[in-house]
Amino acid sequence: MEAAHSKSTEECLAYFGVSETTGLTPDQVKRHLEKYGHNELPAEEGKSLWELVIEQFEDLLVRILLLAACISFVLAWFEEGEETITAFVEPFVILLILIANAIVGVWQERNAENAIEALKEYEPEMGKVYRADRKSVQRIKARDIVPGDIVEVAVGDKVPADIRILSIKSTTLRVDQSILTGESVSVIKHTEPVPDPRAVNQDKKNMLFSGTNIAAGKALGIVATTGVSTEIGKIRDQMAATEQDKTPLQQKLDEFGEQLSKVISLICVAVWLINIGHFNDPVHGGSWIRGAIYYFKIAVALAVAAIPEGLPAVITTCLALGTRRMAKKNAIVRSLPSVETLGCTSVICSDKTGTLTTNQMSVCKMFIIDKVDGDFCSLNEFSITGSTYAPEGEVLKNDKPIRSGQFDGLVELATICALCNDSSLDFNETKGVYEKVGEATETALTTLVEKMNVFNTEVRNLSKVERANACNSVIRQLMKKEFTLEFSRDRKSMSVYCSPAKSSRAAVGNKMFVKGAPEGVIDRCNYVRVGTTRVPMTGPVKEKILSVIKEWGTGRDTLRCLALATRDTPPKREEMVLDDSSRFMEYETDLTFVGVVGMLDPPRKEVMGSIQLCRDAGIRVIMITGDNKGTAIAICRRIGIFGENEEVADRAYTGREFDDLPLAEQREACRRACCFARVEPSHKSKIVEYLQSYDEITAMTGDGVNDAPALKKAEIGIAMGSGTAVAKTASEMVLADDNFSTIVAAVEEGRAIYNNMKQFIRYLISSNVGEVVCIFLTAALGLPEALIPVQLLWVNLVTDGLPATALGFNPPDLDIMDRPPRSPKEPLISGWLFFRYMAIGGYVGAATVGAAAWWFMYAEDGPGVTYHQLTHFMQCTEDHPHFEGLDCEIFEAPEPMTMALSVLVTIEMCNALNSLSENQSLMRMPPWVNIWLLGSICLSMSLHFLILYVDPLPMIFKLKALDLTQWLMVLKISLPVIGLDEILKFIARNYLEDPEDERRK
């Protein structure tokens, strides 16, 4: 049934053809079940394990590696002689890498449990219905409830469907619907129609929503919608329709992978084609097929060389280390790739309650009557410090601390606050904080009484647990609470009937203490309290009181005001009818006005600084709240989202105002606005969508079930530590302390991580360029193999992997939060950087080939061949005139490979030092700024020595130990790379504009 909230109870009953007293007939139940289906949310069909595994192999680079492994395996199968074992090492290692990557990928996907499944926990098991086949109420499975059923709910029940209330069987009906609407206090319900068909859920005061809890009272209602048609069902559908997009880095790496795979394919084909003329060379035994296979193996080696196999592992390690650092700052990251996305966040959409504010209501102002002289009335106004539930703070008058006990009016005000109250404070010893027990508003009054300490109770030596309610206990010992007249909507107040405690010697009789909405309470006041006397309430006095309340309720403060009053001579207990709430109003008359307290959910202390940080970093903060617009704007001014006197006409909207705009203007509004008030969850998703259409990277906070679709849709969903399981599972990050400032710290960490990732991705790529150049040169010049695939894998995975990981520990730039967010479209490697890495890669490749050639031509223990012999070694036979007296097997010696590999590893270590900073010289940023890098370089070199000097590793890697002369030659060839990169950095610093600066302009 659509818009049930706007229909009268009679219309709802008529729509389903049902009577409130008897309920549906079995025949109607059957028809409705066929028409509407079962009252349950359909289970989400997850991907099978096999589908997840297959997904991991959809990446182009992974497929190229898999192909290389299969080809290597086939070639190894036909290998002869002692090379058989080493030939199998390469495909085996490649497969191991691919399996490890797939396991990590599947584990990550499985770990992000399905938020949709978490919604199931809000489905109640059972429900209580009236049906025509039985006289009394019957308990049935909640899934069997159908639209039109008459359902009974009572305190403690979970609402089984969306229900239109027909009648309330108690004084009041309070519902905790925070999971759905985010309202922090329980909501009082009624039965009258809500005329607005487009009312937001918060305003549907005659509806009970599936999954919410009855906090107090008992009621009868008719089921309007079930299953996926309920509000919680709509949320499920929104989440199911939201596809997870790839993070900017994942997109960049995918693009890079595609480009790399095209380049690899071209180079492999080119190498094979260049050497067609050599297929018949004597070294292949004159067999064309053997020659073709040999060059095919070189093409496979090229593919292995060009792909940075260690990159996925290094990225995962760097992100994992980043998540550990963030966890120390109270940001728990659930999805690794989102660590980097945080770095490009350009908009943060934050909930108000509990994130920008403390979600701990506190009284910050109060007043009592100072004196009344005819029509003249003056007030005593006080302000109170402290913005949490901790009983710490001072009462100030004209900014000077005072003792509350000196003012009789304050003593009575404190008495009303303590007694007209069902809440208390509790010190949580595990968390070390004071927490509320009961309603937020009442806890604020409890805290106020503790701060006022009107009877000068000695509290200094009390433990924190005893301190929590010390001053309230003193007041409660003086007066005994007999009974409570519960809050009701018609009078907007509640009261307690108290009698003096036996031990109390004060000459006071029974009293009624009242608190409630100012207009309602003040209308029933005939007197005002001045000191200990009471004076008649006159028109001007009333005007004065109401004008101050109005002033407090608007403007910068927008305080929530409560009026406090006493009935000095209440009726006798036995004369009062307590089961008829309609008569409570007449008992709460002839009141004496005592004072007013103004409270608010105060902004967190550190939020203002964090918002300034966001402004400096080019990040827009949008506050989204269910509060009314006035309160929302006031909080925005208070925390610095809006300036004190800034015009906010087109920068703040209510959900309704936003909906009334044409679509194009809605999109434009999202580009400008910084405040959305009175919004529904669907608005959050819409706002994210519009922001994404402007290429903004959005972080969205939320804690309720209602926030889950928007959390899932935003690039960074941020759930509160105190939020629901659904919100947490739909988000990328959880704030352990629910604090906005933690988001800003996480953004800073994300930026630092991206900068470091850029460095090590570029470092690994320049290494691969060098390897490709090396293999391409040997093939193009017709030289013997300088590096074989198993050696390349060792370099890519182990020796390069360690320094690359250590580059993740580079300290962040000092101005990291003074730059605008980077564009997600910014390339990983720009034109100049591409040239730089080609230049460095070219040097690496040439140096590696040069080292191998040096051994053949000039080394003391080498064969001393000529350049012609070296480049035509394929034609070497015993009877070939050009190779007279030369053992042809020398061209397969391990020494030149060892020289080439040692030069490659040493140059890569120098390159790691070059990567400490993109453009800063090593003179400005010496190696010891990152001690981890120095450690990893030492470890990489140790591992290189291991494969050179510890048997049987030299045999597996086809290497031989080097002597001192050879090592000196390795250093001579390797060290110039530092000088080359310093020259390129100098050019970048002095003659080319820094791309960061260019973007800032």
From Swiss-Prot:
| Reaction equations catalysed | Ca(2+)(in) + ATP + H2O = Ca(2+)(out) + ADP + phosphate + H(+)
Instruction: Write down the membrane topology.
Output: Multi-pass membrane protein
Q: Which Pfam families match?
A: Cation_ATPase (PF13246), Cation_ATPase_C (PF00689), Cation_ATPase_N (PF00690), E1-E2_ATPase (PF00122), Hydrolase (PF00702)
Tissue expression pattern = Skeletal muscle (at protein level). Skeletal muscle, fast twitch muscle (type II) fibers.
Q: What biological processes does GO assign it?
A: calcium ion import into sarcoplasmic reticulum; calcium ion transport; negative regulation of striated muscle contraction; positive regulation of ATPase-coupled calcium transmembrane transporter activity; positive regulation of calcium ion import into sarcoplasmic reticulum; positive regulation of cardiac muscle cell contraction; positive regulation of fast-twitch skeletal muscle fiber contraction; regulation of striated muscle contraction
Localization (cell):
Endoplasmic reticulum membrane; Sarcoplasmic reticulum membrane
Q: What is stated about the way this protein's activity is regulated?
A: Inhibited by sarcolipin (SLN) and myoregulin (MRLN). Has also been shown to be reversibly inhibited by phospholamban (PLN) at low calcium concentrations in vitro. Dephosphorylated PLN decreases the apparent affinity of the ATPase for calcium and this inhibition is regulated by the phosphorylation of PLN in vitro. Enhanced by DWORF; DWORF increases activity by displacing sarcolipin (SLN), phospholamban (PLN) and myoregulin (MRLN).
- The organism's place on the tree of life at top rank: Eukaryota
Is Cell inner membrane one of the keywords?
A: no
Modified positions (Phosphoserine) in chain numbering: 581
Q: Which SUPFAM superfamilies match?
A: Calcium ATPase, transduction domain A, Calcium ATPase, transmembrane domain M, HAD-like, Metal cation-transporting ATPase, ATP-binding domain N
| Protein name as it appears in the record | Sarcoplasmic/endoplasmic reticulum calcium ATPase 1
